[in-house]
Amino acid sequence: MKTASFILSFVVLLIVIITWIGEVSAVSEPEPVAKATAHAAAVHVPPICSHRECRK
């Protein structure tokens, strides 16, 4: 019974580590991609606001 609980806790820990590494790499990697998509969205999407400053 001890080995089963040890294996279960090890698997849970492994899943947590994998998801944490995935989140960290997702945060650190696509910065230029996010900037490019934000720029493309700012260029192509018409502004919702009707202020003159927002329309420029």
Swiss-Prot record:
User: What are the alphabetically sorted keywords of the record?
Assistant: Disulfide bond, Secreted, Signal
Expression sites (tissue/organ) = Expressed by the venom gland.
Cystine bridges: 49-54
Q: Name one GO cellular component term.
A: extracellular region
- Specify the propeptide location in this chain: 27-42
The signal peptide annotation in the UniProt record is: 1-26
Question: Domain of life here?
Answer: Eukaryota
| Post-translational modification note | Probably contains 1 disulfide bond, which may be crucial for activity, since the linear peptide without disulfide bond is inactive.
For whether the record's keyword set contains NADP, the answer is: no
Localization per record:
Secreted
Instruction: Print the miscellaneous field.
Output: Not found in venom, suggesting that it is a minor component.
Protein name per Swiss-Prot or TrEMBL: Venom peptide 5
According to its UniProt entry, this protein's organism is Eumenes pomiformis (Potter wasp)
